[in-house]
């Protein structure tokens, strides 16, 4: 009963934030936006790749589509919009066949309740992964650290959230089913996700390009089976350099009788000519899947290069990389993969 009351109170608060926006219409359109409502815009994100296994796997190699977004955004008023994004991506079915499947990535109502407050309801972004993608433009390489480890179930989920943006801060908090990517809810348990991001230094200094972010997910697989994840990340970015360092701590219990504590560190760096042109990239992930087991540390290295082109609001990138993964036992090589990937976005 307490859970129902809390959810009811949350719904009431979010409706209160959204109500002023629902009543407001556009008075002075700016920029290139249409002068009347509603209007609809379209866009595409496409990740294509060729990947070759260089260690064991019998030389397996394949061309693949790893993301195919068709982005539809309907703006009903200057403050109320609807986002609908189907996604084509590879899945493995029950017979272990790998096929391309169509599923929904976004289906949400977005309300700009005030100048700095956004309310989102439905299948929409969760606080961490979409934010991390906005910092690191190399999502084309594959899932980011926490998602790759299956600690965060997806970049989108069904739920409701509020995002507040200040001059040097941003806070995003939401309640979600916790299954990820619109999967059906399996039980009564929900996930509460929250992120706070701030720039501790003045914008007019070089240190003003430093950003600190913290994230916490408080969730459950089922009764007495927690899925709690804490992440702290620092990033620095200027025209020619991007660097991120991330620490992850998780208490996880997907299948076993006891909680498993996991730890991880992730580093990523990019040296570049600028927003367009040539770039070199490096990544290192260190992950301890169970801190109770001695000498059980996994390492993942990434080396590569890229070239980026922009045209209007569109972007095209080509990325070539080598990814190697090692186990802790005598630094045993687990996998080595060569990847050539393209990103098309407009």
PLM regions and their residue ranges:
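N-terminal cationic amphipathic segment used for targeting or macromolecule association
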Residues: 16-21, 25, 144, 269, ...
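Short alpha-helical segments used as structural interaction elements across diverse proteins
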Residues: 2-3, 64, 136, 145, ...
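Active-site-proximal helix/loop capping residues that flank conserved catalytic or ligand/cofactor
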Residues: 19-21, 119, 160, 194, ...
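Outer-membrane beta-barrel pore domains
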Residues: 47-59, 77, 94-97, 107-112, ...
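Residue-level detector of intrinsically disordered/flexible regions characterized by low predicted structural confidence
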Residues: 4-8, 69, 73, 302, ...
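Outer membrane beta-barrel
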Residues: 27-180, 186-193, 197-206, 268-281, ...
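Cleavable N-terminal export/targeting peptides
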Residues: 1-28
């Amino acid at each position: 009963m307490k859970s129902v009351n809390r959810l009811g109170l949350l719904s009431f608060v979010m409706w209160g934030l959204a109500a002023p926006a629902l009543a407001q219409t556009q008075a002075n359109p700016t920029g290139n936006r249409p002068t009347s409502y509603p209007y609809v815009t379209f866009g595409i994100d496409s990740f294509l790749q060729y990947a070759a296994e260089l260690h064991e796997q019998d030389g397996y190699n394949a061309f693949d589509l790893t993301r195919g977004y068709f982005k539809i955004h309907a703006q009903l008023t200057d403050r109320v919009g609807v986002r609908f994004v189907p996604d084509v991506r590879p899945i493995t079915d029950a017979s272990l066949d790998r096929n391309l499947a169509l599923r929904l990535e976004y289906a949400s109502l977005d309300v700009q309740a005030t100048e700095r407050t956004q309310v989102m309801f439905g299948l929409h972004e969760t606080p961490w992964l979409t934010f991390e993608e906005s910092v690191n433009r190399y999502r084309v390489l594959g899932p980011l650290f926490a998602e790759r480890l299956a600690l965060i179930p997806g970049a989108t989920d069904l739920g409701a959230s509020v995002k507040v943006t200040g001059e040097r801060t941003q806070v995003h908090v939401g309640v979600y089913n916790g299954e990820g990517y619109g999967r059906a809810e399996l039980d009564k348990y929900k996930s509460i996700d929250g992120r706070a991001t701030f720039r501790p230094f003045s914008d007019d200094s070089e240190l003003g390009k430093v950003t600190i972010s913290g994230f916490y997910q408080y969730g459950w697989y089922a009764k007495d089976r927690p899925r709690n994840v804490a992440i702290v990340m620092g990033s620095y970015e200027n025209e020619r350099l991007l660097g991120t360092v991330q620490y992850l701590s998780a208490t996880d219990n997907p299948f076993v009788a006891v909680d498993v504590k996991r730890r991880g560190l992730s580093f990523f760096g990019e040296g570049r000519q600028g927003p367009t042109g040539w770039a070199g990239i490096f990544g290192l992930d260190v992950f301890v899947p169970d801190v109770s087991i001695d000498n059980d540390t996994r390492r993942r290295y990434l080396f590569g290069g890229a070239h980026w082109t922009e045209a209007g609001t569109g972007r095209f990138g080509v990325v070539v990389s080598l990814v190697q993964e090692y186990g802790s036992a005598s630094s045993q090589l687990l996998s080595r993969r060569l990847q050539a990937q393209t990103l098309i976005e407009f």
